[in-house]
Amino acid sequence: MKSFVCIALVAFAAAALASPTNVASATGSTGSSVTTQDGELEGVTGQGFGDLTRLRKSAYGGSSGGYGGSSIPAPPCPKNYLFSCQPNLAPVPCSAPAPSYGSAGAYSSPVATYVAPNYGVPQHQQQLYSAYVPQTYGYQY
């Protein structure tokens, strides 16, 4: 723990020595010369090492705010456009009209099903299965 505190103090002292501070003086010329030297060190007057304005402007085309401005604003996306917001597409209706059953298409009746318990059973064994077939409603086996 003592070594950690010592390392932290040494790092703090090194950081304090590395960055020059503006010492108050009787004349203001010393402060302005320090500022001028800092500007010459950084290459651009008024920008610090931590300022990323130049990088941001070069990466996003010179826009000052947000993620960069676009030169052409995007049109609002209307509803019922198929797959895209481009203005050259025709609007698609919500449901295609059908001639006979509203918008759900033509009604088709269910496929007819018949009870055929003897399907695939040989003729001589059909009497064995007759007990399981209902004998009412016209089913005569």
From Swiss-Prot:
Q: Localized where?
A: Secreted; Secreted, Extracellular space, Extracellular matrix
Residues forming the VM domain are 71-108
| Tissues showing expression | Follicle cells.
Q: Where is this region: Disordered?
A: 23-48
InterPro entries the record matches: Vitelline_membr_Cys-rich-dom (IPR013135)
Question: What keywords are annotated for this sequence in UniProt?
Answer: Disulfide bond, Extracellular matrix, Secreted, Signal, Sulfation
Q: What modifications follow translation?
A: Sulfated by pip; may be involved in embryo dorsal-ventral axis determination. Sulfation by pip may occur on covalently bound glycosaminoglycans. Becomes part of a disulfide-linked network including other vitelline membrane proteins, including Vm26Aa and Vm26Ab, during vitelline membrane biogenesis and maturation. May undergo both disulfide and non-disulfide cross-linking upon incorporation into the vitelline membrane.
Low complexity biased stretches: 23-36
Q: Where does it sit, as one GO cellular component term?
A: vitelline envelope
Subunit composition and interactions: Interacts with vml and Vm26Ab; forms part of a disulfide-linked network within the vitelline membrane of stage 10 egg chambers.
User: What does the UniProt record say this protein does?
Assistant: Major early eggshell protein.
In its UniProt entry, what is this protein called? Answer: Vitelline membrane protein Vm26Aa
